[in-house]
């Protein structure tokens, strides 16, 4: 694991003949993500003013081959042993198998025992095809000293982030956007707010890839690679991972074999995700996903420690269930209870770590459980991705409920929406009629919706009706034409909710605490098995993740297997009606200088209505409040979070 930063200087650019100025700037910017890798840090450069070149910055969190796999990593064939230079964030879990294959087929020689050299040797011998062979989470930048090209890539699902900015001075890539913002004078990119991205954020509660809220900074999308040269105006980006859900029927003759296939691929994935030279723990909520991962992990580490979090308020904690699950599988368990005071105090620090606003309150308890876990372990496993791959969200059952509408003539179906409009809000059947009148492409755009069209117009002075969710989702839906509706919803979530919310908080919030989070469900081999499941093996009228539950019967304790999903719930609705969080909310709105972007009076009205109980605006308010806090930190600079730099033992 590490935080990486790479700068490809334009020819005759501002870097100077020796690259010393650029190296100094890169070192300063890299320190802003020290938390991603407190074990080692440094820079490396090969720049001359005439032809440009490259500068690397890195912060290493050493997990595998602690003693030898220092960054940047150098490797090459015998005739050019230092041809390639790599900075790498992530882990390659099948690196042992890849190294053996490269030795056997190509005679590759390795100088370390780590996973990074598998990327370098694989790239040399297989080219970009190496990306199809990697089982892991990764974002990396690889400099070829012969072609003078920077090759960057991200893992298929977007577990690890990579931001890109291009300007007159060259192109920079980084694990964290704040590092690029620190390099704006060196690179020379546009730092104005992207109003389209802001509207997308308000609709979705996160900024969808490849956008960011700064016009000059984009994200390399999940499953893509980029080629960057000093003599090019912009990176050349190519998608290498194109997910497909191609269902294969389950029959009475093969059903158990299909469930066994799921069990086997999960066992293999967890076994590989346990590869580390440090202690590995696990996050444990009250659900089947994290419990399954922990139950499989303890086979490889009988002293497994599990961690969970909750709140003091009744109904907002799964600690009791997690404790029972830990006891059932024989794991030691540690719980962190978060108070309202702690919650409020941590918000500026958390938003600074996030880089982009993510209006998901669950990332706050995640921050505290990650901080607690880091006292005991350096790596944790977690259950993210199971819902998207195996059909775990309740909304995936909606096509079953709306199936009768599919038989209506289109004009009649549309009229159902008009019938629903005059019905009172909250009236039984209103939402069903409205959503039934819409096509899947119109009604479903991931697991986030809080503002109606009218409400968006109220809070965004620059609202534009053409900047809707459809300009984010339409290209994705175009790829899934002809699939069953559940598969299409899963596919949308891979490109929206999963990589825009779930994996952003999973990466940023754990790395804020120098803790590596691994997600065994998001493995290419697991996806290959899950993608062949038919809709009926995922969703029924009574349950979700049907096939996964069947596959986990021998692994997950019975009290968890069919329990309703809760996750890490947060009592935002209650806390925004009284107490410290409400006071903080009024103060945040009152001091905000984002009035040209957000209608401050409209947000005040929502706060007042929510406080007195006439409306539940909690999700809408949280979306606005997190943006205002983000704006105060990164644009106004009126809020300066206190960022600690704790010293952790390298070996743990």
From Swiss-Prot:
Coiled coil: none annotated. It catalyses: L-aspartate + L-glutamine + ATP + H2O = L-asparagine + L-glutamate + AMP + diphosphate + H(+). The record marks 384 as: Important for beta-aspartyl-AMP intermediate formation. Pathway: Amino-acid biosynthesis; L-asparagine biosynthesis; L-asparagine from L-aspartate (L-Gln route): step 1/1. The active site is at residue 2. Residues 2-231 form the Glutamine amidotransferase type-2 domain. ATP binds at residues 382-383. Pfam families: Asn_synthase (PF00733), GATase_7 (PF13537). L-glutamine binds at residues 60-64, 89-91, 115. One of its GO terms (biological process) is L-asparagine biosynthetic process. One of its GO terms (cellular component) is plasma membrane. Its EC number is 6.3.5.4. CDD domains: Asn_synthase_B_C, AsnB. Belongs to the asparagine synthetase family. This is Putative asparagine synthetase [glutamine-hydrolyzing]. The gene is asnB.
């Amino acid at each position: 694991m590490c935080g990486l930063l790479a700068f490809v200087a334009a020819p005759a650019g501002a870097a100077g003949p020796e690259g010393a100025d650029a190296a100094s700037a890169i070192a300063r910017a890299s320190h802003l993500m020290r938390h991603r890798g407190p074990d080692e840090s440094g820079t490396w450069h090969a720049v001359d003013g005439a032809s440009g070149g490259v500068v690397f910055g890195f912060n290493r969190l050493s997990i595998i081959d602690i003693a030898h796999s220092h960054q940047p990593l150098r490797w090459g064939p015998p005739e050019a042993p230092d041809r390639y230079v790599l900075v790498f964030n992530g882990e390659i879990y099948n690196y042992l198998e890849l190294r053996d294959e490269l030795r056997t087929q190509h005679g590759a020689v390795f100088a370390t025992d780590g996973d990074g050299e598998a990327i370098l040797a694989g790239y040399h011998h297989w080219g970009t095809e190496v990306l199809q062979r990697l089982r892991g989470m990764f974002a990396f930048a690889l400099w070829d000293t012969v072609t003078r090209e920077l090759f960057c890539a991200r893992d298929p699902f977007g577990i690890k982030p990579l931001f890109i900015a291009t300007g007159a001075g060259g192109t920079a890539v980084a694990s964290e956007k704040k590092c690029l913002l620190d390099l704006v004078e060196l690179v020379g990119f546009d730092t104005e707010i992207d109003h389209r991205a802001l509207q997308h954020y308000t609709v979705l509660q996160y900024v969808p890839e490849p956008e960011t809220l700064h016009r000059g900074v984009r994200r390399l999308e999940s499953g893509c690679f980029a080629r960057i040269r000093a003599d090019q105006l912009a990176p050349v980006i190519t998608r290498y991972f194109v997910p497909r859900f191609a269902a294969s029927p389950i029959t009475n003759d093969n059903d158990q074999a299909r469930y066994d296939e799921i069990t086997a691929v999960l066992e293999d994935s967890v076994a590989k995700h346990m590869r580390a030279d440090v202690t590995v723990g696990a996050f444990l909520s009250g659900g089947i996903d994290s419990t399954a991962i922990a139950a499989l992990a303890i086979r490889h580490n009988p002293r497994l420690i599990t961690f969970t979090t909750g709140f003091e308020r009744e109904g907002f904690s799964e600690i009791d269930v997690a404790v029972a699950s830990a006891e059932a599988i024989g794991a030691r368990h540690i719980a962190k209870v978060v108070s309202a005071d702690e919650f409020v105090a941590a918000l500026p620090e958390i938003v600074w770590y996030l880089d982009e606003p993510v209006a998901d309150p669950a990332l706050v308890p995640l921050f505290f459980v990650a901080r607690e876990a880091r006292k005991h372990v350096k790596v944790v496993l977690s259950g993210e991705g199971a819902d998207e791959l195996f059909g775990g969200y309740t909304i995936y059952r909606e096509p079953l409920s709306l199936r009768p509408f599919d038989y209506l003539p289109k004009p009649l179906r549309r009229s159902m929406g008009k019938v629903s409009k005059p019905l009172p809000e909250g009236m039984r059947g209103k939402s069903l009629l409205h959503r039934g009148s819409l096509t899947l492409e119109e009604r479903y755009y991931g697991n986030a919706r809080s503002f109606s069209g009218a409400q968006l117009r109220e809070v965004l002075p620059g609202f534009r009706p053409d900047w809707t969710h459809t300009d984010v989702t339409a290209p994705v839906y175009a790829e899934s034409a002809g699939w069953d509706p559940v598969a299409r919803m899963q596919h949308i979530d891979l490109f929206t909710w999963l990589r825009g919310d779930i994996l952003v908080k999973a990466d940023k919030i754990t790395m804020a605490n120098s803790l590596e989070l691994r997600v065994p469900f998001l493995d290419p081999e697991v996806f290959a098995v899950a993608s062949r499941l038919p809709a009926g093996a995922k969703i029924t009228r009574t349950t979700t993740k049907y096939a996964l539950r069947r596959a986990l019967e021998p692994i997950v304790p019975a009290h968890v297997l069919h329990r309703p999903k809760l996750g890490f719930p947060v009592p935002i609705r209650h806390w925004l009606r009284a107490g410290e969080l409400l006071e903080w909310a009024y103060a945040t709105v009152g001091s905000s200088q984002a009035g040209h972007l957000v209608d401050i009076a409209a947000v005040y009205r929502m706060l007042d209505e929510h406080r007195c109980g006439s409306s539940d605006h909690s999700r809408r308010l949280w979306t606005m409040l997190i943006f205002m806090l983000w704006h105060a930190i990164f644009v106004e600079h009126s809020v300066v979070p206190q960022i600690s730099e704790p010293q952790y033992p390298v070996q743990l």
